[in-house]
């Protein structure tokens, strides 16, 4: 049973159903209800205040949460007591994503590079920190949640930071993380039986528009994955494996993703020279110093809406892998040959990424048949049977292939078959930020 909505529930559910699993979805939000129904039965939270009776009645083996907020639901304790497998770490293990400063402390303990960071409870404290550390900061909420009062604000100069500190919501304080440039990448693994099993190295295109311009959107506009069970780029060795003592101590079993930036830690530090600040604002030069190393930006404990569906398609037995992970058993990962790379593209709707701007429900047209995965998100079916776009994120189009260029080309060929007035997609995924460590 998936706990979620939209393209996450549609994609994860369909990938597992195709692998032979009996899939259902408990709808946890008030939108995106139609797409999961294409993968299996759905249950609305208004009709079923808790999923636990459904889990018992239907003899569910595994639940897969879309968000870490399931742990704050009134039924969370009952879910844990039910004995069902949960494809997520629980308890103390969740803190590595939930609490940003806890992740920083873990990295300090295990000597993992992490940007200089501070927590401030109000504007006065935040401005005092900036005065003592005159450098650009990325502004985040101290607690990670889809409903956080502050979503990531990437400031590339001291002046940017100062301006935003006057404007943000301090309801939960702010987490100020040193800006280290744009050479970002991620690595996703499973932790089970006290071991780390690498899956893919990934890239997310988080900026709203081509050329990595505009604001950091609420969710990525595109993504790439490369099958990487041997940790080709060293992200797991440097940033995940040192955590093994803690992972074992807290009985961590489930997905883990690290997002990191390659930097020598001088990028983004204070300087009186305007030239350095101008270079920082552009994300630094494309050539990377041989002395640069990966720095953790954050950890996530979910398989993710961008990379998750591609990972499940790459695995030969995804349902079995998930089940064994929830049981904390040793894993033997088998991949489908020739599916070495994946590309995900998002079709964004009217007004996105500025979610305050909303349009009407709009007709959705498809010209021809798809030959890759298309996962509907904020889409519904009208009384006439035709599809309509109902929100800001319409679909995720995902293609896999043996070569990266082939996966990208297939994804673009298919996303161009969808038409919704006012919609758009990035046309440059793969042209920057890849290979990992470049901008």
Language model features with spans:
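A conserved helix-loop-beta module that forms one wall/lid of the active-site cleft
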Residues: 87-152
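Short, low-complexity intrinsically disordered segments enriched in A/P/G/S/L with frequent Arg
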Residues: 273-274, 280, 284-291
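Active-site "cap" helix and flanking loop/linker of ATP-utilizing ligase/carboxylase catalytic domains
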Residues: 236-256, 264, 300-371, 382
